[in-house]
């Protein structure tokens, strides 16, 4: 393990990147230096300058330096993105997911460690052999142990993934079939409910017709009975009135007969005749009373 906590291979990769960054940084610094040198050669030819002239010179220099520094910072950011892309692409080939901690990029202690590492590596760079900057690709290592276990685990996960996909497809088919069956059953249920409602409506209509017919029959019978009773009552009333008239007539005749009897009481033959008449009248009265009592009881 080296100063950065990396193995030798990865440390060499870091050194190559730092060499690349130092080279780009040196070029940009030379560009900035040339900006100042050009300014000296082209503008600082007079012995004295006015305030406006000094301001103009400094503003021009500021614009040039600002452009160069901004370009370098942008280029550095893009370069770092490309470097991360290479690392992530190689990790994805091994089904790995790398994570970064952005907050560590501003860790002052770690930055100082990197500075010390750069100083140790490049201050005496003339005494060290130049390392080949060609970056080797991260290729699978044909060794046992961890690599073999990782390959087996990847293969097992792939097989399990295929099984899960197959099972998911089967479940989806079953779910679709179940939904179709549910839809069919719902349609059948709706049809049955509709038929039941129609039958209930038909039965209700039939029951209503039967009830109306029954009510009509009962009403007709009641009206007939009422009419018969009315006619019978009318007949009884007529018979009663006739009987009363007959009774009054007989009573009148009886009264007349009694008066006549008093006149002819001394006449024996007449008396006998009158007695016979009186007896007959009494019999008629009894008969009429019986008839009258019978009619009154029926009423």
Curated annotation (Swiss-Prot):
Keyword Coiled coil carried by entry: yes
Indicate where this protein resides in the cell.
Answer: Cytoplasm
Q: InterPro entries given for it?
A: LZTFL1 (IPR026157)
One Pfam assignment: Leu_zip
Q: What induces it?
A: In hippocampus, up-regulated by exercise training.
Coiled-coil regions in this chain? 96-299
Q: Name one GO cellular component term.
A: cytoplasm
Question: Taxonomically, which superkingdom?
Answer: Eukaryota
User: Carries keyword S-adenosyl-L-methionine?
Assistant: no
UniProt note on tissues of expression:
Highly expressed in testis. Expressed in brain, cerebellum, eye, heart, kidney, liver, lung and trachea. In small intestine, graded expression along the crypt-villus axis with high levels in the villus apex and lower levels in the crypt stem cells (at protein level). Not expressed in skeletal muscle and white adipose tissue.
Record keywords: Coiled coil, Cytoplasm
Gene Ontology biological process? flagellated sperm motility; negative regulation of protein localization to ciliary membrane; spermatogenesis
Which residue stretches belong to region Interaction with BSS9? Answer: 145-299
The Gene Ontology terms for molecular function here are: identical protein binding; protein-containing complex binding
| Free-text function comment from the UniProt entry | Regulates ciliary localization of the BBSome complex. Together with the BBSome complex, controls SMO ciliary trafficking and contributes to the sonic hedgehog (SHH) pathway regulation. May play a role in neurite outgrowth. May have tumor suppressor function.
Q: How does it assemble?
A: Self-associates. Interacts with BBS9; the interaction mediates the association of LZTL1 with the BBsome complex and regulates BBSome ciliary trafficking.
Protein family? Belongs to the LZTFL1 family.
Q: What is this protein called?
A: Leucine zipper transcription factor-like protein 1
Q: Which organism is it from?
A: Mus musculus
Per UniProt, what is the name of the gene that codes for the protein in this document? Lztfl1
């Amino acid at each position: 393990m080296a100063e950065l906590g990396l193995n030798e291979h990865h440390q060499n990769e870091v050194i190559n990147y730092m060499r690349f960054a130092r080279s780009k940084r040196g070029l940009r610094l030379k560009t900035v230096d040339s900006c100042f040198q050009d300014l000296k050669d082209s503008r600082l030819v007079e012995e004295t300058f006015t305030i406006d002239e000094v301001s103009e010179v400094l503003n021009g220099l500021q614009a040039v330096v600002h452009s160069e520094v901004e370009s370098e910072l942008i280029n550095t950011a893009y370069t770092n993105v490309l470097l991360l892309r290479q690392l992530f692409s190689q990790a994805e080939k091994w089904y790995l997911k790398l994570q970064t901690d952005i907050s560590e990029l501003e860790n002052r202690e770690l930055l100082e460690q990197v500075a010390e590492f750069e100083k140790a590596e490049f201050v005496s760079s003339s005494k060290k052999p130049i390392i080949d900057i060609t970056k080797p690709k991260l290729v699978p290592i044909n060794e046992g142990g961890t690599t073999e276990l990782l390959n087996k685990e990847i293969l097992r996960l792939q097989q399990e993934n295929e099984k899960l996909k197959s099972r998911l497809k089967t479940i989806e088919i079953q779910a679709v079939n179940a939904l179709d069956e549910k839809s069919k059953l719902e349609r059948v249920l709706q049809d049955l409910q509709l038929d039941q409602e129609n039958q209930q409506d038909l039965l209700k209509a039939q029951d209503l017709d039967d009830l109306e017919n029954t009510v009509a029959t009962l009403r007709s019978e009641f009206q007939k009975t009422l009419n018969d009773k009315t006619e019978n009552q009318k007949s009884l009333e007529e018979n009663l009135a006739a009987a009363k008239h007959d009774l009054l007539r007989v009573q009148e005749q009886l009264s007349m007969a009694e008066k006549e009897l008093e006149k002819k009481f001394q006449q024996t033959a007449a008396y006998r005749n009158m007695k016979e008449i009186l007896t007959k009248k009494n019999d008629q009265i009894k008969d009429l009373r019986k008839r009258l009592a019978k009619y009154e009881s029926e009423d």
